[in-house]
Swiss-Prot record:
Signal peptide: none
Keyword rRNA-binding among record annotations: yes
Residue ranges of the TM segments: none
Alphabetized GO MF terms: rRNA binding; structural constituent of ribosome
Subunit structure: Part of the 30S ribosomal subunit.
Keywords: Ribonucleoprotein, Ribosomal protein, RNA-binding, rRNA-binding
Name of the molecule in the record: Small ribosomal subunit protein uS17
Family: Belongs to the universal ribosomal protein uS17 family.
Matches recorded under NCBIfam families: PRK05610.1, uS17_bact
Gene3D superfamilies: Nucleic acid-binding proteins (2.40.50.140)
InterPro entries to which the protein is assigned, alphabetical: NA-bd_OB-fold, Ribosomal_uS17, Ribosomal_uS17_bact/chlr
């Protein structure tokens, strides 16, 4: 059944640290998360590298950025940098 009012799901946003800005209009962002081990209950760090679109080339290595999910921009990019939360030192 279709919903009459055009409600959209809220876009996913994630925070990560820029580890590379060598590409044009693209940054590589490291996103870390913690998962709980199924048997032992210990929390383990896991990380994912994501390519994100940075239209104005404002991000530098070490910056903490907020990204949102968008329609695919290229083969590997479907995230866009929304905001630079913290600049690198």
């Amino acid at each position: 059944m279709m919903n009459d009012n055009n409600e959209r799901k809220p876009l996913r946003t994630i925070k990560g640290r820029v580890i590379s800005n060598k590409m044009q209009k693209t940054v590589t962002v490291l996103v870390e998360r913690q998962i709980k081990h199924a048997l032992y209950g210990k929390y383990i760090k896991r990380s994912t590298k994501i390519h994100a679109h940075d239209a104005d080339d404002l991000c530098n290595e070490g910056d903490v950025v907020l990204m949102t999910e968008v329609a695919p921009i290229s083969k590997t990019k479907n995230w866009r940098v929304v905001e630079i939360v913290a600049r690198s030192d």
